[in-house]
Amino acid sequence: MAAKIIDGKTIAQQVRSEVAEKVKARVAAGKRAPGLAVVLVGSNPASQIYVGSKRKACEEVGFVSRSYDLPETTSEAELLELIDTLNADKTIDGILVQLPLPAGIDNVKVLERIAPDKDVDGFHPYNVGRLCQRAPRLRPCTPRGIVTLLERYNIDTYGLNAVVIGASNIVGRPMSMELLLAGCTTTVTHRFTKNLRHHVENADLLIVAVGKPGFIPGEWIKEGAIVVDVGINRLESGKVVGDVVYEDAAERASYITPVPGGVGPMTVATLIQNTLQACEEYHDVEEA
């Protein structure tokens, strides 16, 4: 069986076009365009690339994009003060602080300082808690993006055995909550999991997010499984690969996401969706 490719690039472009249409309609109706503030501390090259793509996506859909590039020497107090200012700014619907932050700045304190209704990354404990309670508001971008991919390909998730490999706060944990909402019987594996192969072989839906190239061999994949590879790993040769051995897995799976061009584009597209949602559902009321 040759797997159908889940084309994240195309779906992400659809999502962005849908948002752009809604923004155009808002502006035509005399409402303001949504605003996103992107905060970068220091000059981590990978972070600069991510931030650049987020800002570009914002401008393409007609958002107001505000950039705050702070030096490596920025103190935690200065960063928190900026967040307070942005929380109070009625033209800003979303605040994104690019991680990782430099040493000496407490990630948790910073993320918790962002107002939950401006937390477009979906990392605030309030938003994670709402997801756990089956009443989500702003949802973490990568997991929500994966759910969107499955929905757009009309993949029925109810009753599937879903296995999430990796238990990070950014992907694995919120992904498990999204899968429960989507009707899956969900298992989360992590570095202490025994007999990982057994779990993978029983997965109807496999989500892999560990950041290790070729971590899951293709022969472990159950015949007909749906494989979502969140990993983005650059080899010494410069080639970008996922956490799953793609060629072998694609022979056994029914659907598979490629790397690059699978999950990655959806993360930014979902950030854009979240910002529009924050604007329309939580901030328009204040202007009425």
Swiss-Prot record:
PROSITE patterns documented for this protein: THF_DHG_CYH_1 (PS00766), THF_DHG_CYH_2 (PS00767)
Pathway(s) served: One-carbon metabolism; tetrahydrofolate interconversion
InterPro entries: Aminoacid_DH-like_N_sf (IPR046346), NAD(P)-bd_dom_sf (IPR036291), THF_DH/CycHdrlase (IPR000672), THF_DH/CycHdrlase_cat_dom (IPR020630), THF_DH/CycHdrlase_CS (IPR020867), THF_DH/CycHdrlase_NAD-bd_dom (IPR020631)
Function of the protein: Catalyzes the oxidation of 5,10-methylenetetrahydrofolate to 5,10-methenyltetrahydrofolate and then the hydrolysis of 5,10-methenyltetrahydrofolate to 10-formyltetrahydrofolate.
Protein name per UniProt: Bifunctional protein FolD
Cellular component GO terms, alphabetical: cytosol
Gene name tied to this protein: folD
Record's subunit section: Homodimer.
Binding sites annotated in the UniProt record for NADP(+): G166, A167, S168, I232
Highest taxon in the source lineage: Bacteria
Keyword Oxidoreductase in annotation: yes
The enzyme's E.C. designation: 1.5.1.5, 3.5.4.9
Keyword Oxidoreductase: yes
Family note: Belongs to the tetrahydrofolate dehydrogenase/cyclohydrolase family.
